[in-house]
Amino acid sequence: MKDYDDVILRPEASELSKTEFCNPAFDPEAGPSCPPPALQRDVGSRLQAPWHAQRLRGLQPDCHFSWFCILLLSGLLLLLLGLLVAVILAQLQATSLPRTTKNPLLTRGLTPMGVIPSTTPNTTTTTTTTTPARTGQQEAAMSPTHQTTCGGLLPGPSGFFSSPNYPDLYPPLSHCVWHIQVAAGQTIQLKIQALSIESMLTCLFDRLEIISEPTGPLLRVCGKTPPATLNTNTSHLRVSFVSDNDVEGSGFQAWYQAVAPGHWSCAHNEFHCDLLLCLKRDSVCDGITECADGSDEANCSAKTLGCGGNLTGLYGVFSTPNYPQHYPHQQLCTWYIEVPVGYGIRLEFHNFSLEAQAECKFDYVEVYEASNLGTFSFLGRFCGAEPPLNVVSSMHQLAVIFKTDLGISSGGFLATYQAINTTESGCPWAEFCQSGGYRDLQWMCDLWKDCANDSNDNCSSHLSPQPDLTCEPVQVEMCLGLSYNTTAFPNIWVGLATQTEVTDILRGYKSLTSLPCYQTFQRFLCGLLVPRCTSLGTILPPCRSVCQAAEQQCQSSLALLGTPWPFNCNRLPVAASLEACSQP
């Protein structure tokens, strides 16, 4: 009996299985590792098969493993293809968005065309294209963008810029400076399209300043009325926006463009009076010559459509067109009242009925007083159904302007004026004190309480309170603790109707509390805005010395803020008596 087996080794068979023969006698420790008999028979049959058949059968792949690889590779390929399609679609959508998206609200902050807004804090986007001068329709078609930048360089031939966050409220304590630089030999045309900045005398707190480099300041604006188009003869402008830490507004938006010298223009609703200057339409034929060539006041009789004119008698009457019927739309009437030198003028309105609006922006009457220098100073603007207080002026010239828009019409007014001889006595206004009219600060009834022969009798009877003028406690927090505790409203000197309006205004002055001169400035400001009410029912302005002390102490501090002293102290009375003015 054989104790060994015959073994035939084939190289190709070794590829099919690592173990072609198994004998437990030679590997006792392996345990039952031999394949089952069926498998042994299968191996034996494969060894007995022809060589080429065994070769072909040995090269067949594992079907289960191959299908798994195919599925895996197919999935990866589909995933990559999907990612590629997504990237392509995203790029196509990004490039087609400006053409398919409608313009957002045109009140958003504007960004120049063709430039992606920068995220750098101190940069502002500008145009880099050399497009021709824009028309109004082209400007409106531009797609505005919410702009958060504050200042920067604007080197392109045209562009837009706006206050931070426009049209939302601009942040407090902002100081943004834009430098507009166009090519040498070109000049800059600037247009402020929208404006809503805290309004205050001389734009003391929040303001937009335009400065020509290197000549100096051109314009300072605040409030809610955009100025006319600004044409310059420089290629470099510096635009500065400043806000304090109190009252905010929506700010501004503006555009600029490079213009060849001599090719300046104005907007369609503006008056182009000479090479550079543009005027708002309501500044034309208003009695104040602003154009160097006087063209804004030329041929005004033809423009007023039969209203307005020159009144030179000692007494006169004038009225709105069609009075007492409704006045026409789009009227601009100017009456020039002139009496002999040495006379003043008393103006009174009767049956007053104009379109009512809080700021008298639509239909209104304005009164101007001539100065000794030949210019006109603004006295007041009136509208609504209540006649204005009588206007008494020490000057011998007044200008009365009546303007209407396209909207509501009403009955208008009838007005009379009378000349007053200022040289007949030492108390020229005594007989007119009872009217309590709106007048120059130096010609108030209080100044003339001591009349001829040092007697108070002539004027004291006329110092009774006005029908709607009664003393009331001072309620403005900033003005508590003055030398007096009663006031009266309306305040005809500054055009404020209630103490609430004063409180709103004084919020802007809180930023000055840190100045060394604040207490002196506070006394003067409260004396002007919340005047003293006397036991006789009259109101007293602050004395000139109070204003001068505040000016002397605060002028240098305000200069550091870039603001000149905003008040003319010479308009206030000298303390001729205890009842001439107040010492808050």
From Swiss-Prot:
Domain LDL-receptor class A: 265-301, 426-460
Keywords: Cell membrane, Disulfide bond, Glycoprotein, Membrane, Repeat, Signal-anchor, Transmembrane, Transmembrane helix
GO BP of this protein: eye photoreceptor cell development; retina development in camera-type eye; visual perception
Glycan attachment positions: N233, N421, N458
CDD domains found in the cross-reference section: CRD_FZ, CUB, LDLa
Membrane topology per record: Single-pass type II membrane protein
Residue ranges with Low complexity bias: 119-132
Tissue: Expressed in retinal pigment epithelium and ciliary epithelium of the eye.
Positions of the UniProt region annotated as Disordered: 108-140
Principal location class: membrane
GO cellular component terms attached to this protein's record: apical plasma membrane
Segments passing through the bilayer: 70-90
Record's function text: May play a role in eye development.
Protein name: Membrane frizzled-related protein
Organism: Mus musculus (Mouse)
